[in-house]
From Swiss-Prot:
Residue ranges of the region described as Framework-2: 35-49
One BP term from GO: adaptive immune response
Note, other: This chain was isolated from myeloma proteins that bind beta(2-1)-fructofuranosyl moieties (inulin).
Protein name as annotated: Immunoglobulin kappa variable 11-125
Biological classification of the source: Eukaryota, Metazoa, Chordata, Craniata, Vertebrata
SMART domains: IG (SM00409), IGv (SM00406)
Alphabetically ordered keywords of this record: Adaptive immunity, Disulfide bond, Immunity, Immunoglobulin
Organism: Mus musculus
Region (Framework-3): 57-88
Disulfide bond positions: C23-C88
Amino acid sequence: DVQMIQSPSSLSASLGDIVTMTCQASQGTSINLNWFQQKPGKAPKLLIYGASILEDGVPSRFSGSRYGTDFTLTISSLEDEDMATYFCLQHSYLPYTFGGGTKLEIKR
């Protein structure tokens, strides 16, 4: 199975900060990767698909990039509403696998 190693598991940042999190695939090429945002009690929301394509309606402060088997989600100019857990999903190789998640908190 392809393992998706996500880091950090949690982070705290201030409003207006630039935040990054990464997922690294343990193996494979041509990995198709999505990023999701999940808030407590809510269904996951697709942010980015194909590693870097922004889903319709998602603010442009979210962006995704890829270098080989390393994938990065960046949030620029952090806002209060961005407090959530973020996770990646690879859906190129069965079984599809998720990263462990990154819990993002806002420093007060």
